[in-house]
């Protein structure tokens, strides 16, 4: 494990595999993690299973629990058919201050490139019921929205939302991150772009925030970036910083990649512990083109 001057840099070769893909080869993924520390001290993890196009795509979101952050027990599995969607992407799992849980589910509208975000609420993560789903981020005819990163801080919900333009059907892979706020985590006010692509750089095609850390000197974020349309779904990880949550500036990167396959290391999520330690979760490409889900622990800085 290395550390930049901002955030820990993952080392997939020494990390522990949390979940293997359910098939071999390109398009078979276990990943898109969203980690949360529960009031019981356990780690709760939402993630996504995917098959290739034509075989189900993102067919399930899973919620699991672990005492040690490495060995997980599945609590509930959410099937894409229960949401009437073509595919599920990375969920956002959050513990609600004062009690209760939410999972924000990214749903692909059948036959289109459009995405929306639904939310499920429950007293505990075993009780999520798709029949109670309601759409909180519908997107529109111009923009598909998915993969929210949601954080409660100082009495306000903060969100970093991945946006895809739909104006050019052959270029819907382009992406940027928009910032939003909410007093209740349900009704959102969307603000300006928090992080966009960097022309001519490794993230010129897209920039998607995957995890945000509040630091003494501002806000720090991991994000996924890609240079070309051909790199879609095989992103690398970079770091961005800002004095405001709604304006993040990319640092030179990428900072992390897989040593196997396409080199993709993406959707990094983390849990920060009270003692300053941190546990990372991320999706990593493998030699055969599949992706697995890995974790590693980062001890407190000295």
Region roles according to the model:
Residues 269:
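Conserved active-site neighborhood of enzyme catalytic/cofactor-binding cores
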Residues 1-86, 94-147, 151-205, 213-263, ...:
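Beta-rich carbohydrate-recognition and catalytic domains
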């Amino acid at each position: 494990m290395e550390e930049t001057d901002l955030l820990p840099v993952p080392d997939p070769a020494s990390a522990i595999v949390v979940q293997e893909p359910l098939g071999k080869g390109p398009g078979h993924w276990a990943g898109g993690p969203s980690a949360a520390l529960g009031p019981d001290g356990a780690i709760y993890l939402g993630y996504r299973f995917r098959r290739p196009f034509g075989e189900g795509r993102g067919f399930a979101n899973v919620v699991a629990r672990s005492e040690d952050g490495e060995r997980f027990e599945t609590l509930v599995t959410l099937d894409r058919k229960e949401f009437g969607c073509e595919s599920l992407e990375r969920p956002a799992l959050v513990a609600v201050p004062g009690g209760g849980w939410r999972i924000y589910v990214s749903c692909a509208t059948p036959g289109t490139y459009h995405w929306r975000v639904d939310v499920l609420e429950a007293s505990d993560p075993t009780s999520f019921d798709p029949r109670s789903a309601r759409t909180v981020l519908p997107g529109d005819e111009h923009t598909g929205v998915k993969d929210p990163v949601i954080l409660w801080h100082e009495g306000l919900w903060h969100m970093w939302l991945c946006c895809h333009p739909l104006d050019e059907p052959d270029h819907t892979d382009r992406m940027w991150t928009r910032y939003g706020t909410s007093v209740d985590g349900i009704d959102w006010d969307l603000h300006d772009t928090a992080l966009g692509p960097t022309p001519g750089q490794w993230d010129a095609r897209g920039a998607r925030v995957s995890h945000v850390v509040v630091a003494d000197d501002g806000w720090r974020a991991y994000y996924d970036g890609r240079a070309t349309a051909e790199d879609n779904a095989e992103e690398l990880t970079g770091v961005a910083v800002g004095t405001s949550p709604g304006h993040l500036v990319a640092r030179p990167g990428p900072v992390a990649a897989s040593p196997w396959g396409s080199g993709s290391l993406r959707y990094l999520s983390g849990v920060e512990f009270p003692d300053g330690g941190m546990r990372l979760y991320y999706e990593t490409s493998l030699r055969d083109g599949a992706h697995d889900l890995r974790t590693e622990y980062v001890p407190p800085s000295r």
